[in-house]
């Protein structure tokens, strides 16, 4: 019976995980996105040969996640353009006391290594923990100083938030200004990005509250912004400002932007918070525990698209943005891709329901074989989840369960563990009853 249930769940997830073709037209695709993800707030901005069009709330503020890196990258590139720092400057010279090791030997990291995501750091929270809420950029940098890199700097690409938070500290140490002050005065104000903020905006009225999946629904969900994590992923913006931002990049109104574009020559290149893709487009995605976003643009096609949402369904958000871009450039758009957290929500919603059913069955049955089989299977499943998920996601179980994963995940896990304990207790009771019967 257990095997049939598991196979049924897997089959259902596989069917629901296949891309589903979206309706043609941007409005239709946005409606399809809302229907599939249960996300209530989606804002889209399109740049098409100088004309900007908005879909949804253009003034509502979203966390833009790792789209923030392109702002930090531009801030650093401006310092390079002014000669205040050089790409081959050592990080240890720009951040006093900071060291890094590879193969147990101290090695030099450069500014370019950070900009190109070739530092040797990875995005593993286990190996390189993010800052706590009270940490400054300097305190966080010192907390990871001296840690072993996963590869020799400059040799292998590995996406990491560490690189761009270090760049934020380099901005502070080079300019004598706070990261926030520099980014506002040198990037946001000159580009007239009045609504974009470094971290949480002072005026919170226009913030669209983030949300989190759970039981095939969404719930409002807020996560405190950590000051030392802002340079890599915690700007707020709206599609009104992003339209201005895209216009500047597509029309080439800034020499630092041109320098960044020139650093993205071939497919897969990463530089200053941007990546070049197979079709020659340039873009970046963003995802925090309660928001997801994506931006892509092409100077050649004079097309740009950005999608902002208040739900962490990054893969689905990416596919929506890519589909809109494809349609605008005369290509066939694909389907909306089911995000991993959506799949998890489907699985653990089912696990929760199944767990409750098994709990009831365990409480009413007196069959030792059923209790032993069910208890053993649930114990094995619980242990595998507890051990494997941190390995798969490169983060602690607590962080996965209570910050990133859908609410159904931790609920389902607690139900599984409860079932294991209750089944064991019931088995002891059944055996005791049998013993008393035989004695009597």
Give, region by region, the residue ranges found by the protein language model.
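N-terminal Sec-pathway targeting helices
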Residues: 1-7, 368-373
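Hydrophobic secretory-pathway targeting helix
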Residues: 2-24, 46-49
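Cross-kingdom Sec-pathway N-terminal secretion signals
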Residues: 6, 20-24, 28, 63, ...
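Extracytoplasmic/secreted envelope proteins and their assembly/folding machinery
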Residues: 27-31, 73, 88, 92-95, ...
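Short active-site loop at a secondary-structure junction
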Residues: 37-40, 54-113, 151-161, 230, ...
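Short, surface-exposed loop or secondary-structure junction motifs
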Residues: 103-289
């Amino acid at each position: 019976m257990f095997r049939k249930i598991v196979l049924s769940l897997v089959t259902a997830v596989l069917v629901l995980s296949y891309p589903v073709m979206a309706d043609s037209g941007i409005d239709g695709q946005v409606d399809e996105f809302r229907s599939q993800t249960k996300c209530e707030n989606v804002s889209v901005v399109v740049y098409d040969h100088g004309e900007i069009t908005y879909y949804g709330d253009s003034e509502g503020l979203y966390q833009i996640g790792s789209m923030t890196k392109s702002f930090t990258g531009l801030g650093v590139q401006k310092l390079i353009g002014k000669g205040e720092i050089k790409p081959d400057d050592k990080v240890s010279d720009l951040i006093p006391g900071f060291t890094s090791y590879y193969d147990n030997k101290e090695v030099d990291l450069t500014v370019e290594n950070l900009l190109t995501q070739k530092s040797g750091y990875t995005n593993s929270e286990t190996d390189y923990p993010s800052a706590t809420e009270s940490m400054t950029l300097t305190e966080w940098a010192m907390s990871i100083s001296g840690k072993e890199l996963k590869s020799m700097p400059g040799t292998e690409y590995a996406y990491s938030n560490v690189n761009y938070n270090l760049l934020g500290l380099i901005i502070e140490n080079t300019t004598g200004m706070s990261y926030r002050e520099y980014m506002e005065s040198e990037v946001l104000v000159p580009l007239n990005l009045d609504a974009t903020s470094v971290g949480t905006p002072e005026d919170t009225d226009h913030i669209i509250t983030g949300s989190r999946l759970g039981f095939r629904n969404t719930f409002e969900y807020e996560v405190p912004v950590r000051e030392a994590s802002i340079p890599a992923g915690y700007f707020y913006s709206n599609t009104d400002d992003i339209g201005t931002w895209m216009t500047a990049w597509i029309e080439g109104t800034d020499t630092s932007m041109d320098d960044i574009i020139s650093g993205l020559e071939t497919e897969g290149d990463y530089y200053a918070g941007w990546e070049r893709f197979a079709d020659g487009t340039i873009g970046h995605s963003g995802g925090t525990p309660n928001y997801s976003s994506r931006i892509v643009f092409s100077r050649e096609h004079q097309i740009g698209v950005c999608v902002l949402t208040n739900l962490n369904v990054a893969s689905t958000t990416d596919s929506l943005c890519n589909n809109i871009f494809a349609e605008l450039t005369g290509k066939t758009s694909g389907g909306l891709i089911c995000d991993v957290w959506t799949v998890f929500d489907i699985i653990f919603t089912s696990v929760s329901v199944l767990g409750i059913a098994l709990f009831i069955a365990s409480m009413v049955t007196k069959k030792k074989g059923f209790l032993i089989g069910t208890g053993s299977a649930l114990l094995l499943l619980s242990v595998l989840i507890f051990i494997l998920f941190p390995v798969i996601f490169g983060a602690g179980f607590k962080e996965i369960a209570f910050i990133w994963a859908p609410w159904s995940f931790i609920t389902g896990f607690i139900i599984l563990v409860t079932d294991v304990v209750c089944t064991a207790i019931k088995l002891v009771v059944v055996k005791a009853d049998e013993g008393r019967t035989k004695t009597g």
